[in-house]
Each structure stands twice: as C-alpha cells, then as structure tokens.
C-alpha cells in the first residue's frame, strides 16, 4: 500500500495537523516507508508460532490489591463549581 500526496493531505486534515507544502513530500515518503515495513512484517509466515506477551520470562512481585485511601468524593465535590449525580460538570470545549 502506498499513499499519494492527496491521501496525506486528507489524513493531516482529519488529524487536525498543519502540514506545510514543503513538508508534504517528506511526510508522504516517511509514511510510505512505515507502511512498507508493515507490509514486510505481514508477509512473514507466523504459522505455528505462539503469540508472545513479553520477551522475558520474568514474573513481578506485586503488592496486595488493598484499598489504602478513604473515599473523599463528597468532600471534593462539595467545593466543585458544578456537580450533578456525582459527576463534575465542565464547560463545553468542542463544538
């Protein structure tokens, strides 16, 4: 899969990225290079290979899952400017 200049412009627009005209050729080449690497990895035969969760066979000593702090929800919400049904109300940011 290769991307054209128009594809990169559309992706940049959808991601709200501001790309200069001078940056488009370099960005297109970089994205095509990444996609080429992904294509190479997808071409590798992985039949019979068990998925790997972690490269090292090590286990971690974990602490006990115990509640260590008290519930201060009401105290925190009592000083909030706007709360409804236990949720903080905030101004709308995105139109």
Curated annotation (Swiss-Prot):
Reactions catalysed: L-glutamyl-tRNA(Gln) + L-glutamine + ATP + H2O = L-glutaminyl-tRNA(Gln) + L-glutamate + ADP + phosphate + H(+); L-aspartyl-tRNA(Asn) + L-glutamine + ATP + H2O = L-asparaginyl-tRNA(Asn) + L-glutamate + ADP + phosphate + 2 H(+)
UniProt keyword annotation of tRNA processing present: no
EC number(s) per entry: 6.3.5.-
The keyword ATP-binding is assigned to this record: yes
Annotated disulfide bonds: none
GO biological process, one term: translation
InterPro entries: Asp/Glu-ADT_sf_sub_c, GatC
Alphabetically ordered keywords of this record: ATP-binding, Ligase, Nucleotide-binding, Protein biosynthesis
MF (Gene Ontology): asparaginyl-tRNA synthase (glutamine-hydrolyzing) activity; ATP binding; glutaminyl-tRNA synthase (glutamine-hydrolyzing) activity
Record family assignment: Belongs to the GatC family.
Subunit structure: Heterotrimer of A, B and C subunits.
Functional summary from the UniProt entry: Allows the formation of correctly charged Asn-tRNA(Asn) or Gln-tRNA(Gln) through the transamidation of misacylated Asp-tRNA(Asn) or Glu-tRNA(Gln) in organisms which lack either or both of asparaginyl-tRNA or glutaminyl-tRNA synthetases. The reaction takes place in the presence of glutamine and ATP through an activated phospho-Asp-tRNA(Asn) or phospho-Glu-tRNA(Gln).
PANTHER family in UniProt: GLUTAMYL-TRNA(GLN) AMIDOTRANSFERASE SUBUNIT C, MITOCHONDRIAL
Protein's name in the database: Aspartyl/glutamyl-tRNA(Asn/Gln) amidotransferase subunit C
């Amino acid at each position: 899969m290769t991307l054209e200049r128009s594809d990169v412009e559309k992706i940049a627009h959808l991601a709200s990225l501001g790309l200069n005209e001078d940056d488009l050729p370099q960005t297109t080449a970089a994205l095509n290079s990444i996609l080429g690497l992904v294509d190479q990895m997808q071409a590798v035969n992985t039949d019979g290979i068990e998925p790997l969760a972690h490269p090292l066979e090590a286990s971690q000593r974990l602490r006990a899952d115990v509640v260590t702090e008290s519930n201060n929800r009401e105290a925190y919400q009592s000083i909030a400017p706007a709360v409804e049904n236990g949720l903080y109300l905030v101004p709308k940011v995105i139109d």
